[in-house]
Amino acid sequence: MRKSIIAKVVTGALVGVLVSACSAEKNTASVDDVEPQPNKAGEVWPKLDIEVKSNATVETKVEEILSTMTIEQKIAQMIQPEIRNITVEDMRKYGFGSYLNGGGAFPNNDKHATPEDWVALAEKLYQASIDDSLDGSTIPTMWGTDAVHGHNNVIGATLFPHNIGLGAANNPELVEKIAHITAKEVMATGIDWVFAPTVAVVRDDRWGRTYESYSEDPAIVREYAASVVKGLQGAADKDFLSDQRVISTVKHF
């Protein structure tokens, strides 16, 4: 019995050596002998046709501003602190490009802060950002928030079903209306920017944030994403980023 087992082990080892030898012989080709593969990125990624066209005047102004900025000012524009970790004086000193309120963050750490409280904080931080007495910059800051199914961090705001429920409706037109209502309420609290829509396509229900996905069907997520962006920002040829709209950021994909 033991001889039989030993024979099988030896045979297996010999086969392994032979396979390795064959593989080594096949892999001796020089890198120079390998034919280069064509770049197929253009076939994989569709060509974008963006409705909001570039504005030459704006682009020129941006270039002018960038040419006068110090490295410290440029770095500050790429930093987004959370409202629990900055003060008005910090904003005046550093001139952060943006800031946010994460989950459980409220003006003055007050869960029951009123819309007026939110506006008051937004105004203080805005005025500090354009004060050039310390950082030499007058670039205005922006406030971003997670308003993914209504302005859900604010007491008294209109809340809608979460994304998984909205996806079950399979109604892009309804979702656009919801996004527009959300934009109005976000603007009413002095906030400029919403981190939505979420375009995660959930396929594994073990994920703890499955409810944030509209659907496991990419087609539904695609339709909804376009509707939410339009609802938040407005149509390119109509009220794009008017005083009833906010900036949208597609996220979590």
Residue ranges of predicted features:
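Glycoside hydrolase catalytic-domain context in secreted enzymes
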Residues: 23-253
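C-terminal motif of bacterial Sec signal peptides marking the signal peptidase cleavage site
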Residues: 18-21
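Bacterial N-terminal signal peptides that target proteins for export
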Residues: 1-10
